Every structure is written in C-alpha cells, then in structure tokens.
Amino acid sequence: MIKPGLLLLIFFAPLVSAQDWMATSFEHTEVSPGIYMLSGAEGKMSGGNITLITGTEYVVLIDDGFTPLGPALLQKIEALAGRPADFVINTHAHGDHTGTNQYLDEHGALIFAHDKLRARMESDPEQNTGPGALPIITFSEEMTFHFNGHEAYVFHVPSAHTDGDAAILFRDANVITTGDLLFRGLFPFIDLDSGGSVSGYKAGMQRLIDMSNDATRFIPGHGPVSTRSDLRQDLEMLVDAEARVKTLVDKGLSEEEIVSANPLADYHDDYNWGFITTERMTRSLFRSLTTE
C-alpha cells in the first residue's frame, strides 16, 4: 500500500523537480492577534497549513509540514515568536503534517497528539522519522491548553480523515484549526486505509459547523483561511457527491461503470486537484459505500 505522503511526492516528482514545487520559506497570515497560519511562500508546497500561536508564555505550533523544511520552519517561528516552539500539536499522522516533528523535538518542543496518531506513526517507517518524531503526550478524547490568554480546546474527531484526527478550538479568539477535516474548495482526501470514513468525515465537518458562528475563522488543513459558509458549501458538495455515487451503486453499476458515468462531472472545475482528482473522489466514494 502506498502511503499518502509518498503519493504526494509521486504525483509531483514526474512533473518537476522538488526545488520547483517544494517551498523553501514560509509566508504567514495573521488570523487573530498572535495566531498565524503558515504556508509555503510563493504558492509552493510546504505540506499542510500550520498554525502558530505566539505570546509571552509559550510558543505553540499545530502541525509542521514536510521533513526537509525543518530549518525554514524554525526560522519563520523565530521571526514571528522570537524563539522556537515549546509545544507541537499534531492533527493527524500524515507526513505533510508531522514531517518536522523530529527536528522540532531536537529544538526543545514537546509533541502532543491523539492516541491513535502515535500508534500509526510507530508502525509506519515513512511517518516515524526518528525517536523524537513520536508524540510523548497523547489523549483519547479531549484536552485543554491554557496559555498566552488562550483556552485551546483539543478534541478527537473519530474515523474522519483518519482514525486519529484532532481539531482545535480557540474559544477566546473564535478560531478553529481543522487539520484535514477541511480541504477548502478541494475534493477531500479521506484515508480509508488509515481508519477514515466518509460518514465520519461528514460528521466531523458538521461538528465544526455546529460549534462555530458566522464570525469564526477556520485554518484548514489545505487551502485559505475559511468561514462557516465555506465549510457548509464543502460539506454540501460531499453529501451530494456521495448521494450521486450511491444512486448508481444502488442500480448495480460496477466501479468502472460509475467512473465512466462521471457523476461528479459538474464539480470538476471547482474541486478537482492533482492529488484527489474527480476520478479518485468517485472511486473513494464507491469504495466507502460498498465497504463501510
């Protein structure tokens, strides 16, 4: 089985060399005072979006990007916060969100994550890049951090993108970091081989919507800073896409027949992208409907 992080590299490698698509530096968006979204500069890839929280007490990072970007990430953290990260919270185990765990551990960070995330990283050489890559503090359902005047509520979202997903609500700032529960304006990657499910993904998105309001700002796993309306739009797309594929499954069509029918054709222009194409989304929904 090819792992998600490797799939990303396989997709881009034949097109251009790594120096052409992988970021060498980070840009930032201040979502709320002291809360930043970091992403690859000049539109290049750094992995998933990263949340950085600065302040006088602690420097906290949520997710941390591809492994080669450790030095560039540390430079960006120090530029905004004045020192390295004290804590890292991982939202799930994929290497585009955990790749610099080891590097940040070597620079003093303590890593937190869900129990199942650690278990997956322990068993996967691609994600377990060294002894410091593994979270040393794990939780089963929820935990709350109190730092820099923030109350950060970290909670498990079961069987969604993976089986070890977490999202983080900053109650005071009205900001939510979603991890890969949100691929804004893109077909989502639902990792059925790592405990994810379409039903759990939909439930997770709905939970985020229910705990937010129109002023909430979301830092997605991939894509720009988003709103509650954006989440609703992407959830409506997923619900409708699943229903379209289910109609054909119920008629007895095979996977290849459904792919040929192209039931998601009118979503292609808005949601198709290199990693999750319209065809791959269709196949994922078929597999989910016939195995869950």
Q: How would you describe each model-predicted region?
A:
Residues 13-17:
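N-terminal signal peptide c-region/cleavage motif recognized by signal peptidases
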Residues 1-6:
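Bacterial N-terminal signal peptides that target proteins for export
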Residues 55-60, 68-112:
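Active-site metal-binding motif and surrounding structural segment of the metallo-beta-lactamase
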Residues 34, 53, 63, 77, ...:
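Divalent metal-coordination and catalytic microenvironments
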Residues 28-76, 168-170, 175-178:
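Conserved beta-strand hairpin/beta-sheet module of binuclear metal-dependent hydrolase folds
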Residues 19-20, 210-217, 225-292:
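Accessory terminal helices/loops
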Residues 19, 23-25, 29-30, 57-59, 66-68, 116-163, ...:
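Metallo-beta-lactamase
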